[in-house]
C-alpha cells in the first residue's frame, strides 16, 4: 500500500494521478473531510493531521511506501518529523521526502527547514528517497498571473538571474517511480531542475508570445517587493522566507542549473516552459479581454 500525504496540494494531486495510472493500491491523506471530498471518485482516502500522531498512526497502518510533504510553514520540521516517527513505529518500509533545491547548501529560508527533516530521515535508517525540486512552472500561474492579467506585468527583485523551472507533473512522475519501485531509488537524493534556464525577462517574452500581447517583467528593489507582499496580507515570516529564497536564486545564482537528472529519471524529455505556457495561456488572459 502506498500513502500519498498532502493529496489536496499541487504536488500531492499530481502524485496521486501518477500513482493511480500505475494501478498500484494507494491511500490519499487529507487534513480535513472537506478536502477529502474533493478526491477523485474511487480513491481510498483517510483524514489525518501531521500535528496529531494518533491520527497518523491510524492512517499509516499497513502502508509500505509513503510520500511525505507538508506545507512550507514554520512548523514544517516538527510536523514532518512526526511523519517520520510514525513511519518507523508502524513499519513503513520506504519514504519519499519532498524537500527543496538549496537544502544541501543554503542555511536560510525553506531549504534550511527541509535540510533538518532530511537529516532526521537519514538518521532514522528508514529506506528513503529525497527529491529537491527547483521552483515550479505552476508558480507563474499562482503568483504572477494576477498582475499579468491586470497590468500585463509581473514584479520581483530577481535581476538577470536565471531559473530552470520544473513542471510539477514531471516532479510527480519521479516521486511516483520512487514509490512504486523503491528498491531502484533507495538512498538516492535527486536535485531536479527543469530542461531550460531563463531570466524573468525571457520568461516574460515567452508569456507574451503565448498570450499574443506584450507582457513585461519589472525588476524592483527587494524592499519594494517586501512592502507589496505585506500589503497583500502575507505574514511577515512568509515574506522573509520567500525573499530569502529569492536571494538564493538572484544573488547566489543557484537556480539556473540544467542537468540530465530529470530526463534520465523520466525516460523522456521533460515538459518545456513553452509547452506549459501553451497549455495554461488562458490563466494569463488580460482582464480587459474579459477574463
Model-found features: residue ranges?
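Oxidoreductase cofactor-interface core, primarily capturing Rossmann-like NAD(P)-dependent enzymes
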Residues: 1-37, 41, 51-63, 72-81, ...
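A hydrophobic C-terminal alpha-helical subdomain
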Residues: 14, 18, 223-291
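Conserved SAM-binding strand-loop segment of SAM-dependent methyltransferases
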Residues: 44-47
Amino acid at each position: 500500500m502506498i500513502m500519498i500525504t498532502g493529496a489536496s496540494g499541487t504536488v500531492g494531486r499530481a502524485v496521486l494521478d501518477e500513482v493511480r495510472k500505475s494501478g498500484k493500491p494507494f491511500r490519499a491523506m487529507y487534513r480535513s473531510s472537506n478536502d477529502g471530498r474533493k478526491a477523485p471518485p474511487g480513491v481510498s482516502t483517510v483524514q489525518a493531521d501531521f500535528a496529531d500522531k494518533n491520527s497518523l498512526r491510524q492512517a499509516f497502518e499497513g502502508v509500505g511506501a509513503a510520500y511525505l510533504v507538508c506545507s512550507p510553514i514554520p512548523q514544517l520540521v516538527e510536523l514532518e518529523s512526526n511523519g517520520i516517527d510514525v513511519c518507523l513505529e508502524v513499519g513503513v518500509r520506504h519514504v519519499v521526502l519532498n524537500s527543496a533545491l538549496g537544502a544541501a547548501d543554503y542555511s536560510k529560508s525553506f531549504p534550511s527547514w527541509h535540510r533538518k527533516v532530511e537529516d532526521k530521515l537519514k538518521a532514522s535508517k528508514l529506506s528513503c528517497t529525497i527529491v529537491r525540486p527547483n521552483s515550479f512552472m505552476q508558480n507563474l500561474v499562482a503568483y504572477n498571473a494576477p498582475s499579468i492579467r491586470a497590468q500585463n506585468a509581473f514584479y520581483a527583485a530577481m535581476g538577470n538571474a536565471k531559473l530552470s523551472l520544473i513542471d510539477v507533473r514531471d516532479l510527480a512522475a519521479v516521486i511516483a517511480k520512487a514509490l512504486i519501485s523503491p528498491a531502484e531509488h533507495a538512498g538516492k537524493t535527486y536535485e531536479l531542475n527543469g530542461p531550460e534556464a531563463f531570466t524573468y525577462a525571457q520568461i516574460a517574452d515567452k508569456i507574451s508570445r503565448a498570450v499574443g500581447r506584450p507582457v513585461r517583467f519589472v525588476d524592483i528593489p527587494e524592499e519594494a517587493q517586501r512592502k507589496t507582499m505585506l500589503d497583500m496580507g502575507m505574514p511577515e515570516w512568509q515574506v522573509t522566507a520567500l525573499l530569502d529564497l529569492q536571494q538564493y536564486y538572484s544573488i547566489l545564482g543557484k537556480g539556473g542549473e540544467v542537468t540530465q537528472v530529470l530526463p534520465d529519471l523520466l525516460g523522456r524529455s521533460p515538459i518545456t516552459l513553452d509547452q506549459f505556457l501553451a497549455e495554461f495561456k488562458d490563466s494569463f488572459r488580460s482582464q480587459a479581454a474579459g477574463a
